[in-house]
Amino acid sequence: VRQELKLELKQGFKSRIEDVREEILRKRRAGKLPGDTTSILKQWWQEHSKWPYPTEDDKAKLVEETGLQLKQINNWFINQRKRNWHNN
């Protein structure tokens, strides 16, 4: 009986451990945007380098073109301006 209980517990936790492992891996990958989407954003950035603040319409188009969420677009531009834009 004890051996059966041990085996039962092991089987139950095994699937949960696998679920947690997959979730961790998925969250790690979440940090970087796909290259094809960043190339679209970078192209917009280069075309508007003097004033890289997209309008709401610009953002809506970028959401449509990239498939990213509006928050991701906003964060990308915030980070890009902090890292790469020097307003003269």
From Swiss-Prot:
<keyword id="KW-0539">Nucleus</keyword>
<dbReference type="InterPro" id="IPR005539">
    <property type="entry name" value="ELK_dom"/>
</dbReference>
<keyword id="KW-0238">DNA-binding</keyword>
<dbReference type="GO" id="GO:0006355">
    <property type="term" value="P:regulation of DNA-templated transcription"/>
</dbReference>
<feature type="domain" description="ELK">
    <location>
        <begin position="4"/>
        <end position="24"/>
    </location>
</feature>
<dbReference type="InterPro" id="IPR050224">
    <property type="entry name" value="TALE_homeobox"/>
</dbReference>
<dbReference type="InterPro" id="IPR008422">
    <property type="entry name" value="KN_HD"/>
</dbReference>
<comment type="similarity">
    <text>Belongs to the TALE/KNOX homeobox family.</text>
</comment>
<dbReference type="Pfam" id="PF05920">
    <property type="entry name" value="Homeobox_KN"/>
</dbReference>
<keyword id="KW-0371">Homeobox</keyword>
<feature type="DNA-binding region" description="Homeobox; TALE-type">
    <location>
        <begin position="25"/>
        <end position="88"/>
    </location>
</feature>
<dbReference type="InterPro" id="IPR001356">
    <property type="entry name" value="HD"/>
</dbReference>
<dbReference type="InterPro" id="IPR009057">
    <property type="entry name" value="Homeodomain-like_sf"/>
</dbReference>
<dbReference type="GO" id="GO:0003677">
    <property type="term" value="F:DNA binding"/>
</dbReference>
<dbReference type="GO" id="GO:0005634">
    <property type="term" value="C:nucleus"/>
</dbReference>
<protein>
    <recommendedName>
        <fullName>Homeobox protein knotted-1-like 1</fullName>
    </recommendedName>
</protein>
